[in-house]
Amino acid sequence: MSNAEIRIAIVGAAGRMGRQLIQAVVLAEGARLGAALVRSGSSLVGTDAGELAGCGALGITLTDDLEAVANDFDVLIDFTRPEGTLHYLAFCRQHHKAMVIGTTGFDDAGKAAIEAAAQDIAIVFAANFSVGVNVVLKLVEKAAKVMGEYADIEIIEAHHRHKVDAPSGTALAMGEAIADAMSWDLKQHAVYAREGFTGEREAQTIGFATVRAGDIVGEHTAMFADIGERVEISHKASSRMTFAKGAVRAAIWLDGRKKGLYDMRCVLNLHDL
């Protein structure tokens, strides 16, 4: 890479998040749109990406032919579905393109594929690209180190009716941050559903609760509750542009990085706090 401007390709460019990403690229210094990809056979192929996103003609048309634009971008941003992301991951690895992955819902095999690809290309893989959420991840880590041994820990998340995975990737990232702080295996300490006669709450568990309703962009709360007091650390997003700007920031940050797996806390230099 190391061009004057990073050329960014956006997958799912015709979707809600894709259009926000196009707008974020247009607004960003040090980046420009290189390609805008849509699903195979889309009726929008040939449409100007900027006009679709509401930011004026950019001279970049929507395409479903990844091979045709292979030389037009340095970094690919993908916020789609796991199966599609893994297809683009294989292409980027083969063609030595960096990647920003905001897709959630990967199984262990999908995560392993991302880790393997990072041996050859630079990848930022994060459940959430909001600056605020990544600050929250650091805060819940700190709270867990102080209160985790004795407090009841619950994570509550809410999203719009169209979200297809639960709990959200961000909720799971919060759980992982807490588990890592406690030297726990999240799989052994997580409780994802309660129904019927559950008995008393088990100590040293992390409960997850999920809401799907309306047009909620994203809300997350980590609760550390003891007898007589509780601490709640919350984040509420009101616009997808928050995530889009963070993803573009991550793409620009990747300039000059040849390989490795990073997260948004790397981009924001939060790991050392």
UniProtKB/Swiss-Prot annotation:
<dbReference type="GO" id="GO:0051287">
    <property type="term" value="F:NAD binding"/>
</dbReference>
<dbReference type="GO" id="GO:0009089">
    <property type="term" value="P:lysine biosynthetic process via diaminopimelate"/>
</dbReference>
<dbReference type="GO" id="GO:0008839">
    <property type="term" value="F:4-hydroxy-tetrahydrodipicolinate reductase"/>
</dbReference>
<feature type="binding site">
    <location>
        <begin position="102"/>
        <end position="104"/>
    </location>
    <ligand>
        <name>NAD(+)</name>
    </ligand>
</feature>
<dbReference type="InterPro" id="IPR022663">
    <property type="entry name" value="DapB_C"/>
</dbReference>
<feature type="active site" description="Proton donor">
    <location>
        <position position="163"/>
    </location>
</feature>
<keyword id="KW-0521">NADP</keyword>
<keyword id="KW-0963">Cytoplasm</keyword>
<comment type="pathway">
    <text>Amino-acid biosynthesis; L-lysine biosynthesis via DAP pathway; (S)-tetrahydrodipicolinate from L-aspartate: step 4/4.</text>
</comment>
<dbReference type="GO" id="GO:0005829">
    <property type="term" value="C:cytosol"/>
</dbReference>
<dbReference type="GO" id="GO:0016726">
    <property type="term" value="F:oxidoreductase activity, acting on CH or CH2 groups, NAD or NADP as acceptor"/>
</dbReference>
<comment type="function">
    <text>Catalyzes the conversion of 4-hydroxy-tetrahydrodipicolinate (HTPA) to tetrahydrodipicolinate.</text>
</comment>
<feature type="binding site">
    <location>
        <position position="39"/>
    </location>
    <ligand>
        <name>NADP(+)</name>
    </ligand>
</feature>
<feature type="binding site">
    <location>
        <begin position="12"/>
        <end position="17"/>
    </location>
    <ligand>
        <name>NAD(+)</name>
    </ligand>
</feature>
<feature type="binding site">
    <location>
        <position position="160"/>
    </location>
    <ligand>
        <name>(S)-2,3,4,5-tetrahydrodipicolinate</name>
    </ligand>
</feature>
<dbReference type="GO" id="GO:0050661">
    <property type="term" value="F:NADP binding"/>
</dbReference>
<keyword id="KW-0520">NAD</keyword>
<keyword id="KW-0457">Lysine biosynthesis</keyword>
<keyword id="KW-0220">Diaminopimelate biosynthesis</keyword>
<dbReference type="InterPro" id="IPR022664">
    <property type="entry name" value="DapB_N_CS"/>
</dbReference>
<feature type="binding site">
    <location>
        <begin position="126"/>
        <end position="129"/>
    </location>
    <ligand>
        <name>NAD(+)</name>
    </ligand>
</feature>
<dbReference type="InterPro" id="IPR023940">
    <property type="entry name" value="DHDPR_bac"/>
</dbReference>
<comment type="similarity">
    <text>Belongs to the DapB family.</text>
</comment>
<feature type="binding site">
    <location>
        <begin position="169"/>
        <end position="170"/>
    </location>
    <ligand>
        <name>(S)-2,3,4,5-tetrahydrodipicolinate</name>
    </ligand>
</feature>
<dbReference type="Pfam" id="PF05173">
    <property type="entry name" value="DapB_C"/>
</dbReference>
<keyword id="KW-0028">Amino-acid biosynthesis</keyword>
<keyword id="KW-0560">Oxidoreductase</keyword>
<dbReference type="InterPro" id="IPR036291">
    <property type="entry name" value="NAD(P)-bd_dom_sf"/>
</dbReference>
<protein>
    <recommendedName>
        <fullName>4-hydroxy-tetrahydrodipicolinate reductase</fullName>
        <ecNumber>1.17.1.8</ecNumber>
    </recommendedName>
</protein>
<dbReference type="GO" id="GO:0019877">
    <property type="term" value="P:diaminopimelate biosynthetic process"/>
</dbReference>
<dbReference type="InterPro" id="IPR000846">
    <property type="entry name" value="DapB_N"/>
</dbReference>
<dbReference type="Pfam" id="PF01113">
    <property type="entry name" value="DapB_N"/>
</dbReference>
<feature type="active site" description="Proton donor/acceptor">
    <location>
        <position position="159"/>
    </location>
</feature>
<comment type="subunit">
    <text>Homotetramer.</text>
</comment>
